[in-house]
Amino acid sequence: MKFSVAFHDRPNFWHLGTISLEFTIFEAVPNGILRGHENVTLYLSKSESGSKQKHYDVLIIGSGPAGYTAGVYTSRAKLATLIISGTLPGGQLMTTSEVENYPGFPNGIFGPELMMNMRQQAERFGTMVVDDEVTKVNFKKKPFMIMTHSENYTAEAVIVCTGASPRKLGIPSEQQFSGRGVSYCATCDGPFFKGEDIVVVGGGDTALEEAMFLTKFGRSVKVVHRRDSLRASKILQVKALENPKIEFVWNNVVSDIKGDKKMATVHVKDISSGKEKTFNAGGLFVAIGHEPNTAIFKGQLELDDKDYIMLGNHTRTSVEGVFAAGDVHDHRYRQAVTAAGFGCMAAIDVERWLSERKHVKK
């Protein structure tokens, strides 16, 4: 039996992976939390290798807040629902240490725990969740065909919830300190850096918005930008340049991040002279954009110039019967709570669309 697992062995650091277990003792808790060693918490979720059923009323591609919420709503509407979770079951929140801004949790909640709760809630109403990755889709004919590494499925309706991934710096130490100082969301993690010196990487609207937001918490904020001018809107530039807590480091790129259990210094390099500088910093926020996870939908769905899925009427895509929710379309808000609301809307749209076409017997 396989379980998806995220375990926490030090503050703000999560390991992710899939393990195989032969111990029947775990049968009693196929979805739950096991606490063992002093600082180790395991979030376990039973991983099905496939589903005996191959045709569904609704197939949801991707998990996370949008996918799981959509599953809750479609299953409660008595629609046969399958979620194919993707490469990281639970999405980006599986790499977030603590979530403080999701309603209903006054003391905050660990990202993996929130995702396990959402998954269990969807499964409670009958949603089947398969931990696999979609490799190809065919939306040219109905029923829609969705192919994974291990199985092929068909569905009357599809909800795409594949999200978007933050662009990375591409240096080895970035992954090493991810969750231990390196972050990709100031709104999510800013409050954890009170009194710290902070570095923001980027020169667009997002970078400046995050820099200004972080001045509420950090002792100082340095914005490292590879050019000598900003791409951000003029009004944001004026606000950021006039902010006494923000300092700009022009024509530089981050070359390394160093520290012990947590990052302590950021190393930058001048792209013209090659001269290097070192800054003490407790946090590094990478704000160089996001990339929607839409590669498999090219030629199948209409995408915008940044490859985000375009929506027409509500959550409907360019293909009748295919809907989308969450960060795969939303490149403005990118919050767990907005993704969950988006998933709810898509599920309601799907239910009404299927009901109108009488695909499901009432």
Language-model features, listed with the residues they occupy:
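Beta1-alpha1 glycine-rich phosphate/pyrophosphate-binding loop at the start
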Residues: 48-125, 196, 208-234, 304
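FAD-site-proximal beta/loop scaffold in flavoenzymes
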Residues: 36, 41-48, 170, 175-192, ...
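Residue-level detector of alpha-helix initiation sites
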Residues: 64-65, 88, 164-166, 205-206, ...
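A Rossmann-like FAD-binding core segment of flavoenzymes
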Residues: 122-148, 152-155, 215-313, 352-362
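Predominantly flavin-linked oxidoreductase catalytic cores and closely associated redox partners
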Residues: 152-248, 257-258
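Extreme N-terminal leader/targeting segments of oxidoreductases
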Residues: 21-57
